[in-house]
Amino acid sequence: APGFGDPINFSINNCNSQRNLDKRGKAQAQAIGAAIIQSGFRFNQILSSEWCRCKETAELMDLGKWETFSGLNSFFQGYADKAKTLRQLNSRFEEFKEGVTLLITHQVTISAITGASVGSGEFVAYNTISKEAKVFRLD
């Protein structure tokens, strides 16, 4: 999504009040989803932040059923509480079974958990046990 942060009038329930995916972001989501499908890789579960751009990414990736999870929300501008969000996410990590879970979230959340710096169109493989992170870019 182009820009920086979300507008002052941000509302989690109103996509028009949020920074959303542009054509490039939509194309990136579709391309990443297509590459994953082509590889034959499957996720046990797919979780998305409640922000509209993350939910749209989940839809455009077209990898199957997904659900929102507030533990992936952005705390960059204080729209979500950082400590609470990270507690929820770390607690969810403890519930993960065997297999791989796809998390669709924000740069600030990814960096806080993995220590990795990511840009638009990049994604991170993160091992919740070893705490190892690897950044990937499709192009």
Predicted regions and their residues:
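Active-site-proximal alpha-helix that buttresses catalytic centers in soluble enzyme cores
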Residues: 1-79, 116-139
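Generic detector of bulky aromatic hydrophobic side chains
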Residues: 15-16, 94, 107
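Beta-strand elements within well-structured catalytic alpha/beta cores of enzymes
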Residues: 47-48, 99-105, 109
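Short, surface-exposed amphipathic charged segments that create phosphate/polyanion-binding patches used
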Residues: 80-87
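Membrane-proximal amphipathic alpha-helices
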Residues: 90-91
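A short, structured loop/turn motif at beta-sheet edges
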Residues: 94-99, 128-130
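Short active-site-adjacent structural elements
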Residues: 111-113
